[in-house]
């Protein structure tokens, strides 16, 4: 009887370890690329480009460039930080959407609040999907960008 109990316990333990090993290592989520995106504004557009984000201490960091057409004098560049916990990354890996927040600071020191939602593609284990980003330029101006993301070395 004791042998069966020990064998059952070892079997359950082995399955638990196998399930944990099936998870993608967090290191896979160290870099994320966001596709260039564009949104409409009154009589114009805003194009947003960002190089690959790198994860440091639970936050993704990158720079950004926003080009405003035809109002070129409103173009801006700056730094961008997005906070995403390990648990949120595990949710993405399981195929669950996650919300995130962050901030951007342009070269003039003006801060922009950022909120968004990442929705993974089915069967991609969170490594790619769609992303919706809201940039709060002022109390009354909010820019919404819809694009895609991809984790890993590219």
Predicted features and spans:
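Bacterial N-terminal signal peptides that target proteins for export
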Residues: 1-9
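N-terminal prepro-regions of secreted/extracellular proteins
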Residues: 5, 20-23
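Central antiparallel beta-sheet cores of small beta-barrel/beta-sandwich binding domains
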Residues: 22-154
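Bacterial N-terminal signal peptides
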Residues: 8-16
């Amino acid at each position: 009887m004791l042998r069966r109990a020990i064998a059952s316990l070892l079997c359950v333990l082995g399955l638990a370890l196998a399930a944990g090993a099936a998870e993608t290592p967090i290191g896979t989520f160290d870099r994320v690329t966001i596709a260039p995106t564009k949104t409409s504004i009154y009589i114009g557009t805003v194009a947003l480009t960002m190089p690959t984000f790198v994860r440091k201490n639970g936050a993704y960091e990158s720079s950004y460039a926003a080009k405003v057409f035809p109002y070129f004098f409103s173009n801006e560049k700056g730094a961008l930080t997005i906070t995403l916990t390990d648990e949120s990354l595990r949710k993405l890996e399981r195929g669950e959407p996650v919300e995130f927040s962050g901030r951007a600071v342009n070269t003039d020191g003006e801060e922009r609040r950022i909120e968004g939602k990442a929705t993974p593609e089915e069967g991609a284990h969170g490594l790619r999907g769609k992303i919706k980003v809201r940039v709060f330029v002022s109390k009354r101006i909010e820019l919404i960008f819809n694009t895609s993301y991809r984790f890993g070395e590219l």
